[in-house]
Amino acid sequence: MSRPVRRSPRELTESWPDMPAVDPSGEVARRFAENLRKAMDGRSHRATAELTGVNYSTIQSILSGRAWPDLYTIAKLEAGLNAPLWPGLLRSDE
C-alpha cells in the first residue's frame, strides 16, 4: 500500500508566503520560512548554506515552500544562524 502524496507547503496557501495558510501545518511551514528569511539577514542562499551546513538547494526549497524541513535541518539552521526559527504552537485565534 502506497503512502498518500503530501501537498507542499506552498500548495496550502493562496499566495506563498504572503497569505496565511488555513491548514495549521502549512501555516507553521510558512512562518518557519518567514523566520528563516529574517534570520538570513540579507545573506545569500549559498552563504547561509556555508554558515549552517545545510545544502543551499534545501534552503531554497524551504523558502519557496516546495519542501517540508525535517528536524535535522531545522536544528542545523537554528544553530548555524543562532536564531529560533520554529514558530511554536499556533492557536486557533491567530
PLM feature spans:
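Positions that flank functional sites
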Residues: 55, 92-93
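A generic structural signal for ordered secondary structure
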Residues: 46-49, 59-60, 80
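Recognition helix of helix-turn-helix/homeodomain-like DNA-binding domains
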Residues: 53-69
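Helix-turn-helix DNA-binding elements, focusing on the entry/boundary residues of the two helices
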Residues: 45, 56, 71-74
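A short, Lys/Arg-rich alpha-helix, primarily the initiator
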Residues: 2-45, 51, 86-89
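DNA major-groove recognition helix of helix-turn-helix/homeodomain DNA-binding modules
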Residues: 72-87
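DNA-binding alpha-helical recognition surfaces that contact promoter or target DNA
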Residues: 34, 38, 61, 76-79, ...
